[in-house]
């Protein structure tokens, strides 16, 4: 697949087809090509001998997509930076990346060591350079970086994950084929562009001549606006975290009647709970549900499985799928040997989807990446096992805690808690006393119940948990809330929860 050429062909074949919609703003494939060409021409004329990455700042504005393509057409990787990212972190990204330029689609942070092109300046560039086309020889290709996404680092400093053109082509081609994506579909874009889940909809949509329907953080905070937008969208391909879908399922009208042409649900970024998938099948009986797995360092996702009722009945904890054909999975034991089928260990991903490492961080790169049989490999830090070719994810190795001498996985407890009657959503928060964990707190969004007192509801939930888990894994305390806080990326905001419950 020639990625950029594939996107550009729609500007010729279906120039008036809408490529991207956000609120009242939208762009066609013709406009996407013209404006990204103009921007690429300007970048190449301003930085003829430079290939440093370019920061792209904003939220869900159509200019974000134009800027991404303009950067790569001019031979520069782009770094998506969302409005929600604090100024201090933006500063550290600018310093670590060596970027010399920031393209802004919104009000911009100031005092950065880069040249800033404002939203108005961008529009001037689109106008004054219209009709100019960049030299296709300058475009990003092969093992050159296409985008760099910054993720959280254990040191407190963000890590820039370098994804090459070849990495992205490998992912996009697999996604289009394995998920049976068709020409001209409408894709939900829920994840901010600084979260690599957004790549799961951006490029599969653009290469198939689809329409990206973006919903922003303000809509998500106002369910009335969110569901009004969804009703207008006619979305056919849904891409989100499971947490976001779980939140939508709390609205009774979120069903086939709201989205009658829904064809495919694509989930990544978190564990897909069995009960969430089951509710989706009930609400959208004609749609296909795909559960996928992959870290940012391996280009969005490397495994997938069609979740059917048979799969739901067979597995209480859902498998995350079969590996894409050009990659392979190894399960490594603590002693460095490969675990046999069915035995747990660390998931290691090998193949062309794997990143070339962290930008400007050779020590971190050496720790997480290696070469196996001449191919790049990434040590994920995730626990899991493979059985009959199917990968089962068992949580982060660093989500395992030791409580009163017992080692346990928090996600396992959450899985069983969510399966209880009277529970709509739940997160386990381990509470420390000094340096050690003292007890487990369950933060629960209750479902329908007739208990007059909270302690009676707690007793009923604990009774069910006692049938599923050993006593030492039962949370000592329960807290009830109307919702679980989420990060801008659509994942459970564990840090915020911890600060709330320990305040």
Swiss-Prot record:
Subcellular location: Cytoplasm
Pathway: Cell wall biogenesis; lipoteichoic acid biosynthesis
UniProt keyword Protein biosynthesis, yes or no: no
A Pfam family this chain is assigned to: AMP-binding_C
Record: residues binding ATP: 151-152, 291-296, 382, 393-396, 491
Main location, first listed in the record: cytoplasm
Keywords recorded for this protein, A-Z: ATP-binding, Cytoplasm, Ligase, Nucleotide-binding
Gene Ontology MF annotations: ATP binding; D-alanine [D-alanyl carrier protein] ligase activity
EC number: 6.2.1.54
Keyword Ligase applies: yes
SUPFAM superfamilies in the cross-refs: Acetyl-CoA synthetase-like
Any GO CC annotation of this UniProt entry: cytoplasm
Binding site for D-alanine: 196, 300, 491
Any one biological process term the GO annotation gives: lipoteichoic acid biosynthetic process
Family: Belongs to the ATP-dependent AMP-binding enzyme family. DltA subfamily.
NCBIfam families from the UniProt entry: AA-adenyl-dom, D-ala-DACP-lig, PRK04813.1
Function as written in the Swiss-Prot or TrEMBL entry: Catalyzes the first step in the D-alanylation of lipoteichoic acid (LTA), the activation of D-alanine and its transfer onto the D-alanyl carrier protein (Dcp) DltC. In an ATP-dependent two-step reaction, forms a high energy D-alanyl-AMP intermediate, followed by transfer of the D-alanyl residue as a thiol ester to the phosphopantheinyl prosthetic group of the Dcp. D-alanylation of LTA plays an important role in modulating the properties of the cell wall in Gram-positive bacteria, influencing the net charge of the cell wall.
Name used for this protein in its record: D-alanine--D-alanyl carrier protein ligase
Source species: Bacillus anthracis
Organism lineage: Bacteria, Bacillati, Bacillota, Bacilli, Bacillales
């Amino acid at each position: 697949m020639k990625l950029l050429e594939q996107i550009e062909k729609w500007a010729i074949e279906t120039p008036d087809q809408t490529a991207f919609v956000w609120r009242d703003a939208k762009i066609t494939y013709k406009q996407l090509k013209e404006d990204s060409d103009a921007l690429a021409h300007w970048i190449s004329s301003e930085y003829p001998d430079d290939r440093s990455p370019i920061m792209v700042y904003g939220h869900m504005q159509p200019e974000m997509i134009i800027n991404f393509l303009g950067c790569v057409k001019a031979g520069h990787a782009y770094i998506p930076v969302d409005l929600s990212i604090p100024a201090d972190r933006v500063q550290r990204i600018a310093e670590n990346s060596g970027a010399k330029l920031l393209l802004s689609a919104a009000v911009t942070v100031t005092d950065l060591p880069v040249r800033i092109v404002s939203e108005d300046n961008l529009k001037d560039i689109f106008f004054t350079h219209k009709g100019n086309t960049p030299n296709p020889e300058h475009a990003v290709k092969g093992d050159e970086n296409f985008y760099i996404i910054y993720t959280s680092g254990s040191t407190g400093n963000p890590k820039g994950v370098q994804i090459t053109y070849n990495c992205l082509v490998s992912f996009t081609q697999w996604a289009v084929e394995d998920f049976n994506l068709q020409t001209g579909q409408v894709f939900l874009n829920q994840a901010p562009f600084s979260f690599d889940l957004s790549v799961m909809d951006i490029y599969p949509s653009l290469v198939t001549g689809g329409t990206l329907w973006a919903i922003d953080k303000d809509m998500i905070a106002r369910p009335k606006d969110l569901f009004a937008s969804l009703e207008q969208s006619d979305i056919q391909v849904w891409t989100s975290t499971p947490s976001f879908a779980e939140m939508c399922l709390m609205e009774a009208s979120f069903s086939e009647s709201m989205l009658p042409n829904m064809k495919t649900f694509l989930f990544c970024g978190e564990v897909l709970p069995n009960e969430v998938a089951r509710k989706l099948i009930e609400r959208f009986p004609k749609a296909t549900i795909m559960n996928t797995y992959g870290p940012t360092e391996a280009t969005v996702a490397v495994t997938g499985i069609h979740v059917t009722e048979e799969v739901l009945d067979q597995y209480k904890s859902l498998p995350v799928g079969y590996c894409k054909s050009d990659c392979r999975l190894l399960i490594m034991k603590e002693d460095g040997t490969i675990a046999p089928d069915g035995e747990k260990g660390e998931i290691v991903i090998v193949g062309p989807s794997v990143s070339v490492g962290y930008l400007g961080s050779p020590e971190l790169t050496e720790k997480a990446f290696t070469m196996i049989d001449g191919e790049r490999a990434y040590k994920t830090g995730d626990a899991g096992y493979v059985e009959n070719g199917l990968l089962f994810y068992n949580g982060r190795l660093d989500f395992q805690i030791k409580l009163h001498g017992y080692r346990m996985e928090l996600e396992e407890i959450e899985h069983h808690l969510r399966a209880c009657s009277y529970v709509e959503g739940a997160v386990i928060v381990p509470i420390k006393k000094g340096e050690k964990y003292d007890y487990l707190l369950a933060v629960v969004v209750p479902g329908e119940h007739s208990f007059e007192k909270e302690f009676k509801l707690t007793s009923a939930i604990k009774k069910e948990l006692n049938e599923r888990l050993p006593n030492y894994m039962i949370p000592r305390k329960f807290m009830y809330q109307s919702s679980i806080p989420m990060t801008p990326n659509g994942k459970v905001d564990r840090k915020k929860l911890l600060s709330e419950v320990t305040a």
